[in-house]
Amino acid sequence: MAFKATREQQAAIDTAGNVLVSAAAGSGKTAVLTERVIKKLTDKVSPVSADRLLIVTFTNAAAAEMRSRIERRLDEECRKHPDDIGLMRQRRLLSNAKICTIDSFCIDLVRENFEKAGVSPDFKMSDGYSLLPVNESVLSDILNRYY
């Protein structure tokens, strides 16, 4: 079944520039973002190259679902327009698109810029629990300083 956007959803799809889509679960965010990406990739005047995409989600499942939907929609467009080499190129470049979680995006950013960030190149991510003593210490310092 084809996605039928509401007026508000269509506005998000058509908005120029970067966009943040925030809405309740099941409201169509993934469908809106998928259509927005397809519109950008298939623009006849100034298409965005698929390998330049950055799509950030909160969960691995959401990132995988987003990539899968974009692939399916781009495949549909390629079947509709089999002679469009631009579409074929976009489909090929899609594997290089950065569609990931906020965590993995930030980790990659720090890894690529560890010197500028002033961290060791072999830094490790915390599981959260190991930071509890640090959090308590920082909280204590803040409370002592300001209260």
For each feature predicted by the language model, list its residue ranges.
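P-loop NTPase Walker
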Residues: 1-117
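ATP-hydrolysis module of ASCE/P-loop NTPase motor domains
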Residues: 91-98, 114-147
